[in-house]
Amino acid sequence: MSNAPARSPSPVLTGVFAGPIAGLKYQTPTLSGVTSATGEFQYRADEAITFLVGGIVLGAVKAAPRLNLAQLAKRVDGKLDKLLDPSVTNLARFVHTLDQEGDIESGVTIAPIVHELIGDTPINFSPPVMPMGQGGGGDFADDPTLRQILDRLNATPGVFTARTPRTLCSAAASRNELRRNIRGIVKMTDVRIPLRDGSYVCADVFRPAAPGRYPVVMSKGFYGKSFYHDCICNEADVLRKEEMEDRYFSGNPDGAQYENHETVDTSVWVPEGYVCIRVDARGVCKSPGLQAPFSVQEAEDYYDAIEWAGTQPWSNGNVGLWGMSYLAMAQHNVASLQPPHLKAMIAQGTDSDIYNEALYGGGIFGAGFWNWWWKIWSGNNHCGERRETDWMARALATPFNDPTAYGPNGSIFMRPDMSKATAPVWIVGPQVGAIIHQLGSSETYIRSTAAKARKFDFADAWFPDSYSNKSIAEHMRYFDYWLKGIDNGVMDEPPVRVQVRTGNGAHFVLHENDWPIARTQYRRWYFDARPSGWQNDGRRPNMLRIGETMPTEPARAEYDAHLDLGTPTLAPAGSNDGTPRWSTGISFVSEPMSEDLVLAGYMKVGLWVESTSSDMDVFVSLRVLDEQDREIRYESVVLPVDPVHIHPVGHGLLKVSRRKLDVERSTEYWPVHTHLEEDCAPLRSGEIVPIEVGLNPSTALVRKGCRLLVDIQPYAPAGVPVRAYDKSYHVDAVNRIYTGPQHPSYLQLPIIP
């Protein structure tokens, strides 16, 4: 007999089965039981633990504080990249099907009677390993034993309380839930956020599974918060979206850019200790009410959502906003209302004066973009009949910059009072725009002087780069600073970064303290409406001149204002045929550059113009030709707007009757027009008038030997979405441009020494 003292058992520890999964049987060498309502089980250190349903062994694994179903399949061992393995897919589908309510996002609860009903029924989750290319052993849903089990469970009252008769959970849904379990993510779908008027908006909340209080990253949008885009309105939509999500995380054969349009990827952010919330605006998908984009009510709803998120038990009280395009623009509106829990924003591709920067830029309605956006891009953002205000009709009926329609309390679009937008903001501005965001991002940064801190990136491939590993790391550092209180030096860096494009997608970066860049030199090239003699590309005859010396002789060039618009389409390009848009108007070309020029900032032209009609639309494009007289493509991402043609380096427009300048807002580098009805000045016969046209801020390295090419046209140029076309002053009209000492028409460029 041994005299050694008996070893006392090690302490009992508690673990959690992810989901959570409640009612699951477990056994260790010393303990046994059923997982609790929160998925808890007990074990001792270094023990293996076996999980069962009835007498069916699901698998055994070393006990740990947190376990999930993917760890029970030996071939998978919890690895995210192996979830297509049928052994884990079938196992997860079986367990998920047993949930009483049939809502696995809320966890799985297995009724006690299930174990008795299933008993020791043998079931094979893992088909035999087959030689490569010979399949995986058939569909688990066709397994006769599984069918018998489901028939038995469906016939017994109390096993299932909803979604009856129960069918096998889809493979895609089970894998999607497994991914969240592995990453430690809990998803809550269609959470109702109460609003001040007694209504609500629906949100999807993704939070860390581990207990705690976390900062919130919120987006409130117009496109639908379901996976990738649009709504989930019925069971067919549920299955379709589960399949899309599963394919995205299984190699992404569809080429999806993100989990949800213009919001953060929850699979990246939640594991780093953030709650991510996607909110559907009023009238979108299952949020009741009328759709009213960029309205005061929408901003107030956003305020209420922020305050709700900041006071939830899983929130640390700090809410940040992250979004692109629409989801960026909405941020400035709500920031001007100053919700107390809003602590920082990242707005990428934005506008805060929608009339001037997106809707009626230059006084001409952006028909190509807005019709496409409303009918196509946001056309499936509702369940049933679309519920909306008549904002589009009212916008078309209000072509002037009426502050009652487009001001801080605008009845159509809200223009936020930026002096009240005090939350720290990081703005990412694109250098290529579909009539929106290019000017607006830059102007919004300049107007954000009330913000506690501000940063600005002027970028080329802003949209795809927002989801790059580099951008995610930088944005997370920013929110770590403002939402978690981590002093990581992110705000000690120069606040402005400018990507200077060099052609074919390449660029270099300027790190600056100011935007526009303080050392900018504004140089002028003067138009000369005499033939240049340049042997051009053959597309347009009679190229005219532009140079840094004022021409000594007066000259005039004219062109037809009328063109054939062709067959209209809802695409931003506007039509499939008709007059080629590159062929209209007149063009000015420079001599080869004698030195490299770095362009970065705002551009403008000053023109002396006349028309045989009462008005004229002036579209100006700056392009660059290389030493072989080929146009240089500076953008790194070809826009879907007009993929055949190159987006110009600089682009601007003006309806000439809107030429009156707002002298208080205009600067040396950028003309601002009043667009007030009382300032509208139609042209009189024979009248020659001066105008200034701003070209959206941009960048380019123009190398020695390259030429500048400036197109002046009566309609939207190639590579840019179309605008409204008013036949009343285009048909049979002739437009004229004057140059020379009495009419010094010019191009002004921002040169960085």
Language model: regions and residue ranges:
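Feature for extracytoplasmic/surface-facing segments of secreted or surface-associated proteins
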Residues: S2-I182
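Non-cytosolic beta-sheet module surface loops
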Residues: A18, F41-Y43, L195, V609-S613
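Exposed beta-strand and adjacent loop surfaces of beta-rich binding modules
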Residues: I21-K25, D46-A48, Y200, P495, ...
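Short polybasic amphipathic segments
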Residues: G23-Q27, A48-F51, W370, I376-G379, ...
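Residue-level signal for short segments within beta-strands and strand-turn junctions
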Residues: T28-T30, V53, L195, R207, ...
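Surface-exposed loop/turn positions
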Residues: E47, S199, Y274, V319, ...
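Active-site-proximal cap/loop segments of hydrolase catalytic domains
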Residues: R183-M491, P495
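C-terminal, loop-rich substrate-recognition/catalytic regions characterized by aromatic stacking residues
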Residues: A461-P753
